[in-house]
């Protein structure tokens, strides 16, 4: 399962980097590059575990991206940005779910702790994407 996770993280890095180069909004571009760096860190952590090492769970400290305070800001980007974000949100949902299985099938407590750390980050990535989409009119929240 760790090999699968490593492949997933590499795919996420490529997606985030590629999409960052395709989006119109500078704030979004910065957000996607920040997440790409975190995905690379996850890839490196899994690689360390596959080599029998204890993974370094400390992030290198990517830049914090300020979020818009106006929750009713109208979406002025293009439809392509929304499609890319929908794909990324779906990816984060899938990857987080994938790590559910890995956590339950991890016999080594250190591996389990590292995977839980990665899973929490993936959920945070999804939350950041959701918040961006919601604040830019791309995600209609139903209560």
Model regions and ranges:
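Carboxylate-rich helix-loop segments that flank metal/cofactor sites and access channels
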Residues: 47-86, 90, 138-143
């Amino acid at each position: 399962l760790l090999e699968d996770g490593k492949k997933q993280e590499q795919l996420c890095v490529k997606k985030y980097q590629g999409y960052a180069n395709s989006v119109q909004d500078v704030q979004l571009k910065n957000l996607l590059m920040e997440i790409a760096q975190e995905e690379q860190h996850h890839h490196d952590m899994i690689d360390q575990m596959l080599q029998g090492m204890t993974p370094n769970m400390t992030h290198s400290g990517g830049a914090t991206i300020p979020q818009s305070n106006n929750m009713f800001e109208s979406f002025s980007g293009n439809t392509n940005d929304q499609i890319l974000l929908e794909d990324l949100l779906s990816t984060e949902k899938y990857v987080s779910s994938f790590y559910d299985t890995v956590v339950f099938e991890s016999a080594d407590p250190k591996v389990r702790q590292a995977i839980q750390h990665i899973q929490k980050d993936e959920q945070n990535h999804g939350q950041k994407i959701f918040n961006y989409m919601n604040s830019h009119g791309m995600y209609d929240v139903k209560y």
